[in-house]
């Protein structure tokens, strides 16, 4: 009944629950027999719930292609046209379906769907530690900015694209407040991420829109630089 459920949780058969303040610590792969999406439910959602789901759609656009991404940026979230949302929603679901069909158990390209989630999950867990929980999609939106900043440093992702998305994110989602005192806590939370291998924190980064690069090992110092740049970008 939420936009987030329709574009993310309902597709791909991955189930997970949080445990001990950490995201998705326990879970399984179990595809549904049937998934039915009705946009009528979305029309009664609070704005925060609409925004939360839309962040996952933005992620799908980033890993898919420039045309999909541009159509999402051009959609007016402040006054949603539900007829125009439907094809965007359908395309977003199909992006995830195509990736899941190719890699159902997340051994390869399905990891592209984790864009924004390594740092996003850390933001989300920190918000729970602060006892001021944030919606999942908001955490993903802010995580996208941080991980695109890493993408620029590691893969030369275009800085102008980051600036445009950051302005969009700030307009609709504002910014998650962090200081340098939070860096170690955020890093420690990231060490519990299920995508990590051999002691490395694994990221999905982007070379450009539509060209994700999975299993990127990022140094602690570079993660902290990304936090610095995030704070500079949002004037925190």
Residue spans of the language-model regions?
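Short beta-strand segments
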Residues: 36, 114, 204-206
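Active-site segments that bind and position negatively charged phosphate/pyrophosphate groups
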Residues: 70-184
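A glycine/threonine-rich phosphate-anchoring loop and its flanking beta-alpha core
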Residues: 1-77
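A generic hydrophobic-helix recognition signal that picks specific residues
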Residues: 24, 31, 109-110, 201
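C-terminal charged capping/lid subdomain of soluble metabolic enzymes
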Residues: 55-58, 157-236
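Structural motif
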Residues: 44-49, 81-83, 133-135, 196
